[in-house]
């Protein structure tokens, strides 16, 4: 084995020279230079500074403007809540531990940080699944003129939380475990060891199949069908021009969210899968730290995409920030938006 395993940690560094110490008790500067830990702290600070205001503003603007409280927006707000979980439960902790060079909060703190980070990521993934299914049902109409209403949105929200908890909670109760990863300043699910005492191998397989592969298959199936249907409808002119434009724009926004999610999380998932399937292989702490950087950036891209691609939300946000006046001259009360005939979504 090219790493060092302890009772509740795995350090990707051989202890042949006797320098490895518990990441809960001692600085890990033998893994990387102190300035690299400082860079990690600076990155976490940037994510907090950007992630908290933009996600909080997304929630606040929606509360302030009744016109934004549409069923589809409930799912998008769920993404903002998930991102705030990551900001408060993950980024603030990693910022503090990076400044100290090790995970100062101990195994209990590691469990909490790993739980909130995993919960936030899974809520985001399953929210994208619900959005994909909504787009598929509304645009492709496999169930005739189905209308995505408030009850369906609430059921979708419940699904995201149930599935996220089904992934994040088991390591807290003995099925797998959370351990420090990368530079040992943040925690995640143990991909590094088989750990038969906590049936780690079965959990990792379960997580990759149920909480990563299946959601991606659903998403790609829905959008594959959706792209085909939109092209076919455009060719046959089955819908009005306004409806077609609205459906296309909402669909484009959600697809961009999915692509951004893959950019953020696919490197992390791929590296984690490689580590798990190559037990004991030689890899350094940076090997897992860099993909984690991409994953953590997920907290800021969803609201940015939504604000940039949704004119109605953008106008409402500017009105809120500018004390009731839109500097672009678009009167909130007279803002014209394109609503789809089936889903009542107002995209850009």
From Swiss-Prot:
Keywords for the protein's UniProt record, in alphabetical order: Acetylation, Cell projection, Chromophore, Disulfide bond, G-protein coupled receptor, Glycoprotein, Lipoprotein, Membrane, Metal-binding, Palmitate, Phosphoprotein, Photoreceptor protein, Receptor, Retinal protein, Sensory transduction, Transducer, Transmembrane, Transmembrane helix, Vision, Zinc
One of the protein's GO biological processes: response to light intensity
Stretches assigned to the Cytoplasmic side: 62-73, 134-152, 225-252, 309-348
Positions of post-translational Phosphothreonine modification: 335-336, 340, 342
Motif segment ('Ionic lock' involved in activated form stabilization): 134-136
Protein name: Rhodopsin
Residues that bear N6-(retinylidene)lysine: 296
Gene3D superfamilies with a match to the protein in the record: Rhodopsin 7-helix transmembrane proteins
Record SUPFAM superfamilies: Family A G protein-coupled receptor-like
Region called Interaction with SAG, residue ranges: 330-348
Glycosylation sites: 2, 15
Protein purpose: Photoreceptor required for image-forming vision at low light intensity. Required for photoreceptor cell viability after birth. Light-induced isomerization of 11-cis to all-trans retinal triggers a conformational change that activates signaling via G-proteins. Subsequent receptor phosphorylation mediates displacement of the bound G-protein alpha subunit by the arrestin SAG and terminates signaling.
Disulfide bonds: 110-187
Record-marked site positions (Plays an important role in the conformation switch to the active conformation): 113
InterPro entries documented for this protein: GPCR_opsins (IPR050125), GPCR_Rhodpsn (IPR000276), GPCR_Rhodpsn_7TM (IPR017452), Opsin (IPR001760), Retinal_BS (IPR027430), Rhodopsin (IPR000732), Rhodopsin_N (IPR019477)
């Amino acid at each position: 084995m090219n790493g060092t395993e302890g009772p509740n940690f795995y350090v990707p560094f051989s202890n042949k020279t006797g320098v490895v110490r518990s990441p809960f008790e001692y600085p890990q500067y033998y893994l990387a230079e102190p300035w690299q830990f400082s860079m990690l702290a600076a990155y976490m600070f940037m994510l907090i500074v950007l992630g908290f205001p933009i996600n909080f503003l997304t929630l606040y603007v929606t509360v302030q403007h009744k016109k934004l409280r549409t069923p589809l927006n409930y799912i998008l707000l769920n993404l903002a809540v998930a991102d705030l979980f990551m900001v408060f439960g993950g980024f603030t902790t990693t910022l503090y531990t990076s400044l100290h060079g090790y995970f100062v909060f101990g195994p209990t703190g590691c469990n909490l940080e790993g739980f909130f980070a995993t919960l936030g990521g899974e809520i985001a993934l399953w929210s994208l699944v619900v959005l994909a299914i909504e787009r598929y049902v509304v645009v492709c109409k496999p169930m005739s003129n189905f209308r995505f209403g408030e009850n369906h949105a609430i059921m979708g929200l419940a699904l995201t939380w149930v599935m996220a908890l089904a992934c994040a909670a088991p390591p807290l109760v003995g099925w797998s475990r959370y351990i420090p990863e990368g530079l040992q300043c943040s925690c995640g699910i143990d991909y590094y060891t088989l750990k038969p005492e906590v049936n780690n191998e079965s959990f990792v397989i379960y997580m990759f199949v149920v909480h990563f592969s299946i959601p991606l298959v659903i998403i790609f199936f829905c959008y594959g069908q959706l792209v085909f249907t939109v092209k076919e409808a455009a060719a046959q002119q089955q819908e009005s021009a306004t409806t077609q434009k609205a459906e296309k724009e909402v669909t484009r926004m959600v697809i961009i969210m999915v692509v951004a999610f893959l950019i953020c999380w696919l490197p992390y998932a791929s590296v984690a899968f490689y580590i798990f399937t190559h037990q004991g292989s030689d890899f350094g702490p940076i090997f897992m730290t860099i993909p984690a950087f991409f994953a953590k950036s997920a907290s800021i891209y969803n609201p940015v995409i939504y604000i940039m691609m949704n004119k109605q939300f953008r106008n409402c946000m500017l009105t809120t920030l500018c004390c009731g006046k839109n500097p672009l001259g678009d009167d909130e009360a007279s803002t014209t938006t394109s609503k789809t005939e089936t889903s009542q979504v107002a995209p850009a």
